[in-house]
Regions:
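Conserved lysine of the Walker
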Residues: 62-63
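Accessory nucleic acid-recognition modules appended to NTPase machines
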Residues: 16, 82, 219-370
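Short glycine-rich substrate-engagement loop in P-loop NTPases that contacts/grips substrate
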Residues: 84-114
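Pre-Walker A adenine-sensing motif
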Residues: 30-49
Length: 382
């Protein structure tokens, strides 16, 4: 029995040390990586002594914002040894648990005498991460967190974090950022100058969206890259994260949302459409699916400001957070893409104050608190 206990104890300790050694290896590896990695600068400023949670669609540029912040910290005199960067999408961290987060901290402390600056990329993959994040903030660590679950924007998460973090929604590139990423400057009175490069760039942004990685892709490969991203990352993430069995129904739903960007959609109507293609689907299932898609930050919705409460909930207009995604499903996309692009800008600017109006007459966007009504038309026929 003593021999068995000795062997079991030895194995347990050995595995623990192996885990810590892996953590040390990743800490050092990531320090070297982020020091050398290029990035496309975003129009964002960080308060110097505040902790942040950056939330947005996968591949929307959250990691670039971390790299940018690391670069700025190094420029301000911080050492690369102070940076504790972890990307929880790393395959080597597939089975990581909440308790392992303390192990990472311990591994860092065995390597360096500095107080680390935590950069935790896609931490929502670790169940219970909020407790660890709050503890770090309570002990006055500087922490930057990214995640691709819209629940991280909720008041509940903010409360769990004790109000110690600034929670910021991260969108794909705006058109101005897209221009900057291509080193195109808008000069004064640019509309009267040779603006062919600007028009070409706008056409690219309009049809393929503003995901940062798309900037470096050749135009002939952009649609293929977006299709692979949607199928393998966005759609695949939905299936695995929420254990969805009716994958055909989910595919039809996303396509229908893209095809009906301009029209309000009820749960009943969507359930009927999906049921004709992918078998019987209940309204409750449609409501769940829509919530799942929103949680991945792929879509957002706005309500009719004049509707009764039940209609506000069940009869919304849905938009995609980036034009490249709906364009995968559209044959004649211009009218829908223009309204979607305007919706993105208004949602990024005004957030939950954005509505539509439908009471005998319809107005695409209504900002009641700001005294604005906005109608979007691609052509005179609209």
């Amino acid at each position: 029995i003593k021999e068995i206990l000795h062997i079991c104890t030895h194995i347990s300790v050995k595995n623990y040390n192996m885990d810590k050694n892996i953590a040390k290896k990743l800490i050092l590896e990531n320090q070297q990586m982020v020091k050398e990695l290029g990035f496309i600068r975003r129009n964002v400023e960080f308060e110097p002594h505040s902790c942040y949670v950056l939330v947005g669609l996968r591949r929307a540029g959250k990691s670039y914002m971390l790299y940018q912040r690391i670069h700025d910290l190094l420029q301000q005199g911080h050492s690369i040894e102070e940076i504790l960067y972890f990307n929880f999408e790393d395959d080597r961290l597939a089975d990581i648990q909440l308790s392992d987060l303390d192990l990472i901290k311990q591994a860092y402390e065995e390597l360096f005498a500095h107080k680390p600056i935590f950069m935790l990329d896609e931490i929502q993959l670790v169940d219970g991460w909020e407790k660890f994040a709050r503890r770090l903030a309570d002990h006055k660590y500087l922490v930057y967190i990214t995640g691709s679950n819209a629940k991280m924007l909720s008041k509940e998460i903010s409360t769990t974090l004790g109000g110690r973090y600034i929670v910021q929604n991260v969108f794909p590139f705006s058109f101005m950022e897209f221009l900057q990423s291509k080193n195109i400057q808008l000069e004064k009175q640019w509309e009267y100058l040779d603006n062919a490069p600007i028009k070409r760039t706008f056409n690219e942004y309009f049809h393929f969206g503003g995901l940062p990685e798309l900037v470096i892709r050749e135009e002939s490969f952009k649609r293929q890259w977006l299709g692979n991203l949607y199928n393998k990352i966005y759609f695949g993430d939905l299936i695995s994260r929420y254990n969805i069995r009716n994958t055909a129904g989910l595919k039809v739903l996303v396509r229908k949302l893209a095809e009906s960007i301009k029209q309000p959609q009820s749960y009943n109507r969507l359930a009927n459409i999906v049921s004709t293609v992918a078998g019987k689907v209940k309204q409750e299932t449609i409501a769940d699916y829509l919530e799942y898609i929103k949680e991945t930050c792929m879509i957002f919705s706005i309500e009719n400001i004049e509707a009764k409460l039940q209609d506000k909930i069940s009869n919304k207009k849905y938009y995609f957070i980036d034009n490249g995604i709906p364009n995968l499903f559209l044959l004649d996309p211009e009218t829908s893409l223009l309204e979607n692009m305007v919706a993105i800008y208004l949602y990024e600017t005004y957030g939950e104050d954005l509505y539509y109006y439908n009471d005998n007459i319809e107005v695409d966007f209504c900002l009641f608190e700001h005294g604005k009504a906005i109608q979007v038309s691609y052509s005179i026929q609209d």
